[in-house]
């Protein structure tokens, strides 16, 4: 697979819970695509997950993907926690239902369609892809707020 796509994702929430947005910057062979959306009542973690899901869902065929996020929650979930959640039927070690299991399952489904390399970047330090995803996530929040 020579189709390597860069995806930068971010989520934003004004109040937690509160109105939230997600943003995605996709870069493929120098061409950029922006995606964003939002929800009236959500959390920052749900928006971080939505950004990753929507970015991967936008790919029409199997791709090599480098997905960059500033979310430790997404990184730890995908790289550390999910394997055991799945073994336990989407329960935590304490036998509690996994929070946001609906979105973790959707992310798992999308990840399985592609070859994804996950990268973490510290947020708000000027990383161009992350900053752009942050702007898009905030656009999602603004659009949800404008609909009230």
Swiss-Prot record:
Enzyme Commission code(s) on record: 3.1.26.4
Q: Cofactor comment in the record?
A: Binds 1 Mg(2+) ion per subunit. May bind a second metal ion at a regulatory site, or after substrate binding.
The protein's matches in HAMAP family, at most eight in alphabetical order, are given as: RNase_H
State the UniProt keywords alphabetically.
Cytoplasm, Endonuclease, Hydrolase, Magnesium, Metal-binding, Nuclease
Instruction: Give the source lineage, highest ranks first.
Output: Bacteria, Pseudomonadati, Pseudomonadota, Gammaproteobacteria, Pseudomonadales
Q: Where in the cell is it found?
A: Cytoplasm
Gene for this protein?
A: rnhA
Q: What is this protein called?
A: Ribonuclease H
Q: Which cofactor does it need?
A: Mg(2+)
Q: List the disulfide bonds.
A: none
Residue ranges annotated for the RNase H type-1 domain, each copy included: 1-142
Describe the function of this protein: Endonuclease that specifically degrades the RNA of RNA-DNA hybrids.
**What does the entry list as the binding residues for Mg(2+) 2?**
10, 134
């Amino acid at each position: 697979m020579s189709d390597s796509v860069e995806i930068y994702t971010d989520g934003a929430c004004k109040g937690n819970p509160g109105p939230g947005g997600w943003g995605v910057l996709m870069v493929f062979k120098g061409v950029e695509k922006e995606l964003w959306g939002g929800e009236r009542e959500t959390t920052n973690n749900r928006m971080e997950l939505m950004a990753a899901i929507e970015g991967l869902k936008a790919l029409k065929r199997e791709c090599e993907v480098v997905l960059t996020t500033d979310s430790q929650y997404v990184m730890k979930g995908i790289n550390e926690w999910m394997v055991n959640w799945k073994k336990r039927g989407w329960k935590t070690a304490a036998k509690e239902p996994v929070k946001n299991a609906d979105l973790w399952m959707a992310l798992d489904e999308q990840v399985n369609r592609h070859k994804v390399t996950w990268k973490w970047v510290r947020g708000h330090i000027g990383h161009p892809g992350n900053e752009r995803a942050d702007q898009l996530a905030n656009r999602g929040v603004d659009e949800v707020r404008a609909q009230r």
